[in-house]
């Protein structure tokens, strides 16, 4: 098997490591997926465990995305970005549907941040500033997450003629945006109905 595909598989396995699950088990002996929103990610960790564990989960989940694509870029220099893009998508899929935890994971936002910040940093930073601003203003993390992936995809498409982004990265951002929208479909419904949970408000049931 070609090295690039081995790296893609490895990225999925890396992405499947659920730090929110591990930390919740260690600190409170609970399954994070049975508490709060039921999501295995940093935002739900904040609701259930507090700021410290949530920041730890956020950074570790971002690191999964960074490691997956940076290692792949370094080891497949002639791949025209396709293996790096595939590795990034694989890491996000691993986070969302982890093989180690019955394919019940998170929504992949932090891992997505790691992937996009590593491969298309300017677009990710610009989109990130707007996304963070929207979270601060509305306190809707889901809205900020959706803005981040959507704006990154648009910016990569627009900026590619000046920055020479590989075509693979354009497809990557589109696929990542679609994945994120799918994972946030219930959040989108709640945003539209005005019932979405806001940052800082605890939610005790799934």
From Swiss-Prot:
Pathway note: Lipid metabolism; phospholipid metabolism
Query: Does this entry carry the keyword Lipid biosynthesis?
Result: yes
> Where, per UniProt, does this protein localize?
Cell membrane
For this record, an example GO cellular component is: plasma membrane
Keyword tags: Cell membrane, Lipid biosynthesis, Lipid metabolism, Membrane, Phospholipid biosynthesis, Phospholipid metabolism, Transferase, Transmembrane, Transmembrane helix
- Look up the domain of life of the source: Bacteria
Matching Pfam families: G3P_acyltransf (PF02660)
Q: What is its EC number?
A: 2.3.1.275
Cited function = Catalyzes the transfer of an acyl group from acyl-phosphate (acyl-PO(4)) to glycerol-3-phosphate (G3P) to form lysophosphatidic acid (LPA). This enzyme utilizes acyl-phosphate as fatty acyl donor, but not acyl-CoA or acyl-ACP.
Kindly state the subunit structure of this protein. Probably interacts with PlsX.
Family in the record: Belongs to the PlsY family.
Name of protein? Glycerol-3-phosphate acyltransferase
Q: What is the lineage of its organism?
A: Bacteria, Bacillati, Bacillota, Bacilli, Bacillales
Q: Which gene encodes it?
A: plsY
């Amino acid at each position: 098997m070609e090295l690039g595909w081995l790296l893609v598989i490895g990225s999925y396995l890396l992405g499947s490591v659920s730090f929110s699950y591990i930390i919740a088990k260690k600190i409170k002996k609970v399954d994070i997926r049975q508490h709060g929103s039921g999501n295995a990610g940093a935002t739900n960790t904040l609701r259930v465990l507090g700021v410290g564990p949530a920041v730890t989960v956020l950074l570790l989940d971002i690191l999964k995305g960074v490691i997956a694509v940076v290692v792949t870029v370094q080891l497949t220099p002639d791949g025209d970005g396709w293996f790096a893009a595939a590795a990034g998508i694989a890491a996000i899929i691993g986070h969302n549907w982890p093989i180690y935890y019955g394919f019940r994971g998170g929504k992949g936002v932090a891992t997505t941040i790691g992937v996009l910040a590593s491969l298309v940093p300017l677009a990710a930073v610009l989109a990130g500033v707007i996304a963070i601003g929207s979270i601060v203003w509305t306190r809707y993390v889901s809205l900020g997450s959706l803005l981040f992936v959507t704006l990154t995809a648009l910016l990569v498409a627009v900026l590619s003629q000046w920055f020479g982004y590989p075509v693979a990265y354009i497809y990557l951002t589109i696929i990542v945006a679609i994945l994120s929208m799918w994972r946030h479909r219930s959040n989108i419904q709640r945003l539209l109905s005005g019932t979405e949970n806001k940052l800082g408000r605890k939610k005790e049931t799934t």
